[in-house]
């Protein structure tokens, strides 16, 4: 572990030199890249330096303890030694956690896609409930919600809703929502009082900047068409709707939320970039983690991750076996207990892997 920490500190010092180099200062791309890299390891380096300082103090205090003859002074030095020892152990644990590989996307905004799946109208109504739940949670975090595309369901909810949540660390909180969500309840239209089971799928993609993934203009086909409203009737004859196809991957995005074709192009490009990056990332992750399973599931869109049982006021996250009898609070956006537990489980899993590698 300490060889790895020393390598991190050496890299930090090298980055400090690079960031003072006039050639780097005048290269905005490299300057941004190196500044971010240094910022990402700043806390690890600071903690490691504090650890080394405490370790030196321990050596000095140990020598004093061995040589001190006066009983009162010996007791004082012993107390100081014990405090430093406890501090050293605490810093060691912090360093282990800081060495856990970080998701480079954690600080990004998140693009979320919710779709009604099995269950017809009830599935679409549930998709609307999930959108409301996530919106409420985002509001408690002080994050902004921007609906990018929505297809309302005549009976309520959404057949599909795509939205962005803008806020520092939004992706780190929502990334565990990837997968199929199941609801068990009596629909409003059910006259016999029978419980129905329906599902909705959730996809969470980090917002991707142009510098993060390169998409060439020649690889995109853009088609324009008139926007359509409920029932398919034309509501806009200015051909403002846009369909973008990324030819190498076959990823398609349609956007007609805005009256302006330019704005629809901008929104479509954001989603396209995120989906293409996600596809590449998923492929790479499959190769890297072919023999490893995540503590909180695979992240596959089809994986059933959670059940919302209304009659029993129960929510169960199947990935970690967590059951909470607070469905009424959770659907109002009080997701902290679930999200925090998932984050801790993922950290514990990564820490276990790290300990195996050290």
From Swiss-Prot:
Job description of the protein: Peptide chain release factor 1 directs the termination of translation in response to the peptide chain termination codons UAG and UAA.
Family: Belongs to the prokaryotic/mitochondrial release factor family.
Any one Gene Ontology molecular-function term assigned to this protein's record: translation release factor activity, codon specific
Keyword annotations of the record: Cytoplasm, Methylation, Protein biosynthesis
Highest taxon in the source lineage: Bacteria
Chain positions with N5-methylglutamine modification: 233
Subcellular location: Cytoplasm
Post-translational modification: Methylated by PrmC. Methylation increases the termination efficiency of RF1.
Organism the protein comes from: Lysinibacillus sphaericus (strain C3-41)
GO cellular component: cytoplasm
UniProt KW Protein biosynthesis keyword: yes
Protein name per Swiss-Prot or TrEMBL: Peptide chain release factor 1
HAMAP family: Rel_fac_1
Presence of the UniProt keyword Oxidoreductase in the record: no
Gene3D superfamilies: 3.30.160.20, 3.30.70.1660, 6.10.140.1950
């Amino acid at each position: 572990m300490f060889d790895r920490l020393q390598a991190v500190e050496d890299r930090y010092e090298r980055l400090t030199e690079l960031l003072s180099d006039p050639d780097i200062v005048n290269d905005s791309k490299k300057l941004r890249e190196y500044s971010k890299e240094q910022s990402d390891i700043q806390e690890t380096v600071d903690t490691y330096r504090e650890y080394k300082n405490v370790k030196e103090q321990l050596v000095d205090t140990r020598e004093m303890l061995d040589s001190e003859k006066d009983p009162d002074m010996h007791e004082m030095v012993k107390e100081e030694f014990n405090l430093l020892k406890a501090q050293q152990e605490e810093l060691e644990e912090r360093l282990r956690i800081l060495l856990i590989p970080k998701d480079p996307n954690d600080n990004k905004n998140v693009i979320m896609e919710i779709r009604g799946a099995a269950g017809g109208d009830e599935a679409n109504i549930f998709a609307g409930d999930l959108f409301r739940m996530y919106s409420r949670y985002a509001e408690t975090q002080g994050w902004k919600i921007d609906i990018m595309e929505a297809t309302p369901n005549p009976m309520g909810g959404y057949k599909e809703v795509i939205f962005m949540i803008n806020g520092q660390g939004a992706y780190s909180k929502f990334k565990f929502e990837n997968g199929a969500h199941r609801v068990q309840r009596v629909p409003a239209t059910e006259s016999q009082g029978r419980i129905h089971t329906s599902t909705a799928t959730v996809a969470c993609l980090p917002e991707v900047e142009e510098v993060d993934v390169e998409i060439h203009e020649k690889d995109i086909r853009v088609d324009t068409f008139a926007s359509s409203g409920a029932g398919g009737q034309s509501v806009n004859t200015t051909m403002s709707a846009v369909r973008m196809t990324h030819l190498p991957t076959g990823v398609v995005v349609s956007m007609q939320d805005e009256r302006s074709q330019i704005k629809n192009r901008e929104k479509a490009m954001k989603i396209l970039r995120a989906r293409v990056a996600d596809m590449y990332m998923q492929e790479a992750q499959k190769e890297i983690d072919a023999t490893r399973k995540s503590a909180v599931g695979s992240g596959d869109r089809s994986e059933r991750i959670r059940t919302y049982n209304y009659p029993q006021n129960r929510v169960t996250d199947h990935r970690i076996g967590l059951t909470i009898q607070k469905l009424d609070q959770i659907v109002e956006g009080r997701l902290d207990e679930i999200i925090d537990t998932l984050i801790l489980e993922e950290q514990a899993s990564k820490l276990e892997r790290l300990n195996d590698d050290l």
